[in-house]
Amino acid sequence: MDKRHTIMLIAVAVIAIAPLVIYSGLGEDQGYFGGADDSASKAISETGYKPWFQPIWEPPSGEIESLLFALQAAIGALIIGYVFGYYRGRGESPE
């Protein structure tokens, strides 16, 4: 393997592992890693907001909700990959 590739792999590993080492267990009590949904719902509920309508359908469990989210992300990634591949292939085609 080329020296440049080795340095790049080490840099990626350091970038991926550094946050885990720095924040290992710190800040969990203060809610540093709470999701944006939790913060937003808390801020909205403090104002006394009442929703205008109810959802048409709610997934029966959290697992199905996660499945639908993952499926949506996969479809989006496929579309983005197709568009990038299409334009890259169009740029390389001999016309």
From Swiss-Prot:
Entry keywords, A to Z: Cell membrane, Cobalamin biosynthesis, Cobalt, Cobalt transport, Ion transport, Membrane, Transmembrane, Transmembrane helix, Transport
Annotated transmembrane regions: 7-27, 67-87
Lineage: superkingdom: Archaea
Membrane topology category: Multi-pass membrane protein
Chain segments annotated as coiled-coil in the UniProt record: none
The species this protein was found in: Methanothermobacter marburgensis (strain ATCC BAA-927 / DSM 2133 / JCM 14651 / NBRC 100331 / OCM 82 / Marburg) (Methanobacterium thermoautotrophicum)
GO molecular function: cobalt ion transmembrane transporter activity
Listed InterPro entries: CbiN (IPR003705)
Family stated for the protein in its record: Belongs to the CbiN family.
GO CC, alphabetical: plasma membrane
Known function: Part of the energy-coupling factor (ECF) transporter complex CbiMNOQ involved in cobalt import.
Subcellular location(s) of the protein: Cell membrane
Record GO biological process: cobalamin biosynthetic process
Pfam families: CbiN
Quaternary state and interactors: Forms an energy-coupling factor (ECF) transporter complex composed of an ATP-binding protein (A component, CbiO), a transmembrane protein (T component, CbiQ) and 2 possible substrate-capture proteins (S components, CbiM and CbiN) of unknown stoichimetry.
Gene (name only): cbiN
Alphabetized NCBIfam families for the sequence: cbiN, PRK02898.1
UniProt-recorded name of the protein: Cobalt transport protein CbiN
